[in-house]
Curated annotation (Swiss-Prot):
It comes from Drosophila jambulina. It is an enzyme of class 3 (hydrolase). This is Alpha-amylase-related protein. The keyword Disulfide bond applies. Monomer. The record marks 310 as: Transition state stabilizer. Residues 1-20 form the signal peptide.
Length: 494
């Protein structure tokens, strides 16, 4: 009986711990993460203070913080080839990183670090030099900056069969030297690295290539981490938020269900299906059942996105900034529909898969510059600064904890729905106008459409909709309008 009670206690403690790792530790009603891909730490700090906090963003996913290999031309993916765990990259050094985390936390913006626990750098001719000046010999699995030697890695092999668990989790992903996370020493170095970031005030981690590591090894690592730092405004005993990259199309041996109890999981099916719908390959009317009925994870386990830094570069159904009208409609739906832990993308312009972030002649990442409307102009796309997207972050905050009600569709690609009595969204992806009296579920009054304009000093700079005493309003979205979506909420009442 005593053994049973002890086992039950340990089981419940483990369940409680994993549940806590699904909590993003947001401030107030904020509930959207933005991925400021390849931004410098000093620029993120300023963005937190001047743009993200005033517009209600909840957190920032940042690029990998550890020292990486220097590759010719400086492609973005060099950040995913670690040399050591020193906090020096093209985004800045440890002092600048710590300053950024502190300043963002001070204004209620949480920081989530993209971390590389699966591997170190791939092969390199001769001695490689990292962004902190550390030397390594990846071909010999020698990384003295940690230090790691060949005994800390799995034997080299290639992944040729994605249904072979051994290959997926112990062979080398695209030639990257595969760490042995079952080793006590490797575990200790990974935990030390993550704990240092927690000490500096981060709120959690995006775990790159999680499916390439055994779930039981990750469970041990996550469970060994320190609680979040109360000096950065986190409550006592708060656990780091974990979201894991697991690409699961439903037909491979290693599945997302092995990881979703340890933390949230990136729901790639969401990205693929929302792209198909707004590209016109699936009628929007079917989105009424969006979520688990589509084979997605439970809402609290799913990290959702229209595109990410990887799949936006691939051919296929995934939308990106190069299809702006459809991308804005998809993002509006993403942020309005009550499903998932939402993340929006902030990209830089690219012509091919390897395009580096905007940089100067010395290959230093340059800071974003803005026009008079606040949009980025020097190679940075900054989707998060598009009014149609940051306005929907405000919409999502305004309707938090409300249910989806009042669904309407025309049997095809025109839809609308309410979020309780606090918000209303309408979308037109047909080649003809949407012009109809629709139930907005809102209290009577005049509302500013936050997609086409902003509410400034009590006046709307875009479309406005008058809602009658029954909650109905006349909605018009022309097929040729600049935006194919309209959004109203209680905080945008004129």
């Amino acid at each position: 009986m005593i053994k049973f009670a002890l086992a039950l206690t340990l089981c419940l403690a483990g369940a409680s711990l994993s549940l806590a790792q699904h909590n993003p530790q947001w401030w107030g009603n904020r509930n959207t993460i933005v991925h400021l891909f390849e931004w410098k730490w000093s620029d993120i700090a300023e963005e937190c203070e001047t743009f993200l906090a005033p517009r209600g963003f909840a957190g920032v996913q940042v690029s990998p913080v550890n020292e990486n290999i220097i590759s010719a031309g400086r492609p973005w993916w060099e950040r995913y080839q670690p040399i050591s765990y020193k906090l020096t990259t093209r985004s800045g050094n440890e002092e600048e990183f710590a300053d950024m985390v502190r300043r963002c936390n001070d204004v209620g913006i949480r920081i989530y670090v993209d971390v590389l626990l699966n591997h170190m750098s791939g092969d390199f001719d001769g001695v490689a030099v990292g962004t902190a000046g550390t030397e390594a010999e990846p071909s010999k699995k020698s990384f003295p900056g940690v230090p790691y030697t060949a005994q800390d890695f799995h034997p080299s092999c290639e992944i040729t069969d994605w249904n072979n668990r051994f290959q997926v989790q112990e062979c080398e992903l695209v030639g990257l030297k595969d760490l042995n996370q079952h080793s006590d020493y490797v575990r200790s170095k990974l935990i030390e690295f993550l704990d240092h970031l927690i000490e500096l005030g981060v709120a959690g981690f995006r775990v790159d290539a999680a499916k390439h590591m055994a779930a039981e090894d990750l469970e041990y690592i996550y469970g060994s981490l320190s609680n979040l730092n109360i000096e950065h405004g986190f409550p006592h005993n708060a656990r780091p938020f974990i979201f894991q990259e697991v690409i699961d199309h439903g037909h491979e041996t290693v599945s997302r269900e092995e990881y979703n109890q340890l933390g949230a999981v990136t729901e790639f099916r969401f990205s693929e299906e929302i792209g198909k719908a707004f590209r016109g390959n699936n009628a929007l009317k079917w989105l009424q059942s969006w979520g688990t009925d589509w084979g997605f994870l439970n809402s609290e386990q799913a990290l959702t996105f229209v595109d990410n830094h990887d799949n936006q570069r691939d051919q296929g159904s995934v939308l990106n900034y190069k299809s702006p009208k459809q991308y804005k409609m998809a993002t509006a739906f993403h942020l309005a529909y009550p499903y998932g832990i939402s993340r929006v993308m902030s990209s830089f312009a690219f012509d091919d898969h390897d395009t580096p972030p905007p940089q100067d002649a010395q290959e230093n990442i340059i800071s974003p510059e803005f026009d008079e409307d606040g949009a980025c102009v020097n190679g940075w796309i900054c989707e998060h600064r598009w009014r149609q997207i940051y306005a929907m972050v405000g919409f999502k905050n305004a309707v938090r904890d409300t249910e989806l009600t009042g669904w309407w569709d025309n049997g095809d690609n025109q839809i609308s729905f309410c979020r309780g009595n606090k918000g209303f969204l309408a979308v037109n992806n047909n080649l003809y106008d949407l012009s109809q009296e629709l139930n907005t579920c809102l209290p009577a009054g005049e509302y500013c459409d936050v997609i086409s304009g902003s509410l400034i000093d009590g006046a709307c700079t875009g479309k406005s909709v008058t809602v009658n005493e029954y909650g109905y309003g006349y909605i018009h979205i022309g097929s040729d309008d600049f935006d194919g979506v309209l959004a109203l909420h209680v905080n945008a009442k004129v």
